[in-house]
Amino acid sequence: MKSMVKKLKQSLRSGSLEKRKEKEKDIQEEKWFLDNGSIFLKELIADCNGKSIPIRNFSSDQILKATSNFGSSCFVTAEGFYVWYKGIIEDRSYMIKRFSEYKVTQYRVAEVYNEIVLSARMSNHNNFLKLIGFCLEFSLPVLVFEYAEHGVLNHRGGVIVNGEEVILPLSLRLKIGKEIANAVTYLHMAFPKILIHRHIKPRNVFLDENWTPKLSDFSISINLPEGKSRIEVECVQGTIGYLDPVYYTTKMVTEYTDVYSFGVFLMVILTGKPALASTSSDGDYKHIASYVKGFHENGQLDGVIDPKVMEDITSAQKVHVEACVVLALRCCELRDENRPKMIQIAKELKQIETLFRRS
C-alpha cells in the first residue's frame, strides 16, 4: 500500500513537472513572439510606406513538424549564420531558413529583420525567392520561402539534384545570368533609394521547377542615401572572391559593388570554376578574374568555358558565349568607373542570350 502511494505521488509530481515545463515553454514562445513581432512590425511599417504586404504567420509546432525538428533529413544547405531546410506544411513544400542563435551576435540581429523586410518587398518579382511567411516563436525568426525544386547553385555554379550533379547547358547558364542581372537591375532602379545587395554569388541563387533563378539573402543589403551614389560603412561584409576591391579597401558601397560581384558570378557559372581556386601545392589562390583575363589576353577565350558543355554548342554560339565572358571581365575592372551599370549589363545579356538561342 505504501509503495502504491509513493508511486502515485511520484506520478503526480512528474505530471506536475511536465505541465510546468510546458507552461514555461509556452511563456517563452509568447515572449519571443511579442519581442520579434514588435521589432518586425516597426521595420515593416517603416519600409512598406502604407502598402499591404501579405505575409503568413506559422507556429513553432508547424515548423518543427515540417523540418523533423530541424533534422538532417530535411537539410538543404548551410551558409554563414543560417541553415536552409526543406519542409512540408499542409501538403505544400517550402524552403525554411533558420538563423543560428549562436552565430547571430547582437550586431547581426538587425540583419535578420533586414532579410525579412526586404524579402517581403521583393516578393512580387519573379527572380527573387518569394517570402511566404515566418515564425516568431523562436529566439530568432524562422523564415518560410517558396520551394525551389532544383535546389541552390554551388560554389562552382552547378547544382546537385537528388544527390547527383546536374550539368547545366550553356543556354540555361546564359538564361540564369540574364535573369539575375534583371533582378539586380531592379534593386538599383525600382525604388527611390538604390538598394545594393552586397551578397551576389551562386550559393544565394535557387532554381525552381522551371529552372527559373531566384536571388535570395538580403541580410547585408543596404540602401544608398536618396540622391547619393555611395555610402561609407563601418565594416566590409560579403564573401571573399566576390568582394569589390574598391569596396574592400575604402568601405564605400556603390552600385558598382554589385556589378563586380555579378561579374564574378557570371564567370563562375560560365567556367564551372570557383571564384578562388588553388593554383599550386603551396596553398596560393588565384582569382577567377585573373584566370579568365589571362586566356582573354592570349586570344583563347574558348579555353575558359566549362569543357563539359563546349562540345554541345556551334561555332556561331561560341562567339556569343565569348562575348558574355568579355562582359563579365568588364564588370570586374579594378577601377569602378570603368565598369558598366547593371541596366547596361542586363540589356547586353538579353541580346547575347537571344542571339545564342537563334544561332
Swiss-Prot record:
Q: Which residues form the Protein kinase domain?
A: 64-356
Give the domain of life: Eukaryota
Q: Name one GO biological process term.
A: cell surface receptor signaling pathway
Q: Name one GO molecular function term.
A: protein kinase activity
**Keywords recorded for this protein, A-Z:** ATP-binding, Nucleotide-binding
Comp. bias (Basic residues)? 1-10
InterPro entries this protein is in? Kinase-like_dom_sf, Prot_kinase_dom, WAK-like
* Keyword Magnesium assigned: no
Q: Where is the region Disordered?
A: 1-20
Which positions does UniProt annotate for ATP binding? F70, G71, S72, S73, C74, F75, V76, T77, A78, K97
Q: Does the keyword Metal-binding apply?
A: no
Q: State the Pfam families in the record.
A: Pkinase
Q: What is known of its domains?
A: The protein kinase domain is predicted to be catalytically inactive.
Sequence similarity: Belongs to the protein kinase superfamily. Ser/Thr protein kinase family. ZRK subfamily.
Full protein name: Non-functional pseudokinase ZRK2
- This protein's species is Arabidopsis thaliana
- Gene encoding the protein: ZRK2
